[in-house]
């Protein structure tokens, strides 16, 4: 039995209309060695209350996708394509409008909570600042609302914790603070960039359970960026598999996990340790992700793919092969399974 098979499947959500529509998203960085395309013509949609998992190895473009949507690209970054949020184009918004959007509609949880919290400010002050700045609450009102949100994320002794500094919290508790801060303004979209990477497995499970509960309570859509397929299996409705900035596969989470249609997806799933496996050897994908300055001709996964053929020297188009499913591979699905 795999970790994926034992993970609790996400419950059916009550979705209520298209919230985010990303079309041909492209992120390019100018470097001394040339232009680097970190995200290459990405397409996906997200309904209200739905969770999308974006998975792939390091350097696949997952985080840059999130930074592009949040308007947080580095100074040398350039963005193309479109992203329509609640009927409004959000790419390249003026700074003032972008700040308002991030304050009221879209929030992000970053990978390392210790570097995201100000070590010189008490946690309560950092939470209250959000509400006083963006919601116009008084100090007393912001304090009580912050305590309520810490209670909502299962923070023990929430009122007492308001007076503590970040270094007095464990990693899991700091991440709960970050989740509370992200949800204070009741955003419609929450982007979580590797939110459990720095946590032990027990705390990971607690955080994922918490996100599931909060998703149901607030009907918040979530983009979950991770390399942990167990995390995706436990919370996500849909999965987008990325490699070298491109979509390899896209579809419902259950379909991708139980009937993967791309060699890269199969490789990622095979690399998950199995509880019933004999011996100590772990399966891996041979080789390393490509240098984005020197991508191989055609399919970027070709040099590592066990099913590579001559046709793969041309880039396969991303095509629909079943309802709600896309893949970029020339190999027939039946020949992969």
Where are these regions (language model features)?
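A short, flexible loop at the N-terminus of ABC-type nucleotide-binding domains that lies
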Residues: 15-19, 28-41, 72-78, 94-97, ...
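ABC ATPase NBD coupling module
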Residues: 76, 90-107, 125, 133, ...
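A short, proline-enriched helix->beta-strand linker immediately N-terminal to the Walker B motif
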Residues: 184-188
């Amino acid at each position: 039995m795999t970790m994926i098979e034992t993970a609790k499947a996400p419950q059916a959500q009550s979705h209520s209309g298209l919230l985010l529509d990303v079309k041909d998203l492209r992120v390019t960085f100018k470097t001394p060695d040339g232009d680097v395309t970190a995200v290459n013509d990405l397409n996906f949609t997200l309904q209200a209350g739905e969770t999308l998992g974006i998975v792939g190895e390091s350097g696949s473009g997952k985080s840059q996708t999130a930074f592009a949507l949040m308007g947080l690209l580095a100074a040398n970054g350039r963005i193309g394509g479109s992203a329509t949020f609640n009927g409004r184009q959000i790419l390249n918004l003026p700074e003032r409008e972008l700040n308002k959007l991030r304050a009221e509609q879209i929030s992000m949880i970053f990978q390392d909570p210790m570097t995201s919290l100000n070590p010189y400010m008490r946690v309560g002050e950092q939470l209250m600042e959000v509400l006083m700045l963006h919601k116009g609450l008084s100090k007393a009102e912001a304090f009580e609302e912050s305590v309520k949100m810490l209670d909502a994320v299962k923070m023990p002794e929430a009122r007492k914790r308001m007076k503590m500094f970040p270094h007095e919290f464990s990693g899991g508790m700091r991440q709960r603070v970050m989740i509370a801060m992200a949800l204070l303004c009741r955003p419609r979209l929450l982007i979580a960039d590797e939110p459990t990477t720095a946590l032990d497995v027990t705390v990971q499970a607690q955080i994922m359970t918490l996100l599931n509960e909060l998703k149901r309570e607030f009907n918040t859509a979530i983009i979950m960026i991770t390399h942990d397929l167990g995390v995706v299996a436990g919370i996500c409705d849909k999965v987008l598999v990325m490699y070298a900035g491109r979509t390899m596969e896209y579809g419902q989470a259950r379909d991708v996990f139980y009937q993967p249609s791309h060699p890269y997806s199969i490789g990622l799933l095979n690399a998950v340790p199995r509880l019933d496996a004999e011996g100590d050897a772990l399966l891996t994908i041979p080789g390393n992700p490509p240098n984005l300055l020197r991508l191989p001709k055609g399919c970027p996964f070709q040099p590592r793919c066990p099913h590579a053929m001559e046709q793969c020297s041309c880039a396969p188009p991303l095509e629909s092969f079943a309802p709600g499913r896309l893949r970029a591979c020339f190999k027939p699905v039946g020949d992969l399974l």
